[in-house]
Amino acid sequence: MEKINVKELNDNVFETIGKEWMLVCAGNKDHFNMMTASWGCLGWLWNKPVAVVFIRPERFTHGIIEENEFMTLSFLGNSEEARKIYNFCGSKSGRDFDKVKETGLIPVETDNGSIAFDQSRLTLECRKLYKDNMTAEKFLDKDLLQWYGAKGGFHDVYVVEITNAYKK
């Protein structure tokens, strides 16, 4: 992985997050977990490059995010192999499966000790800045509540500073 300036990124975020998806990973070489996310944002806030990540509290990765200052967002591309990894990491819990063993992902330690993956075409290392909890009362467009009916609880929202970016 080659470290790059985050301001050099020129990905179309609608394609990158909305269609390609990403792995959200928290922890360190001794204890980490990753999950697939297809909701998120990249932008500029508080004079910092930021990402916004949405994680349900019941997810195994959520607890590890809570215990750590940093997380990574890893983008594997749109290949058939990447899609298999995304599908597995999005449907199986790290409580029950060794996702590295099951997917063949190769963990790589970042400068801050976070975990990225050798297969990633792009990894954003991020530091938590802000967290909020989504609740039904906060929705201005109540039609959006349809996303939550039978699907489980509301997401927590993390605003994270992009501290490092790595490209393959």
Describe the residue ranges of each PLM region.
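Active-site-proximal mixed secondary-structure blocks
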Residues: 1-37, 41-168
